[in-house]
Amino acid sequence: MYKRQDDDVNTNPYEYALHENFPNPFNPETQIRFSIGGEEAVKLIIYDMMGRQVQTLINGDSFSAGYHIVNWNGLDSKGQKVPSGVYIYRIKAGSFIADKKMLLVK
């Protein structure tokens, strides 16, 4: 049986998925990873637990199909350090919408 080298990868990079950030908990920076199945305009936004928008990491930029990594440095849209706590990161790519929680610990 023929086995492709990428058969051992846990995620098919051509499926829509929002993965766990790494590290989590984090301080001062974390990586947010996602994969999309086709070229899409992507939005990736960070919210606090009150639902307030904290930071926009991607605002409608076009991404190709595959696996992508975006860094967040724990700063809000004004460049200020955000306090310790739980944050939600939400992706929208075409009709795909997903969110996950992450924990910033100082």
Model regions: which residues?
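Glycine-centered coil/turn sites that cap beta-strands in beta-rich domains
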Residues: 6-22, 26-47, 56-59, 69-72, ...
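Conserved small/polar residues in nucleotide/adenosyl-binding loops
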Residues: 1-5
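Short, surface-exposed loop/turn motifs with a glycine/proline- and acidic-biased composition
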Residues: 58-94
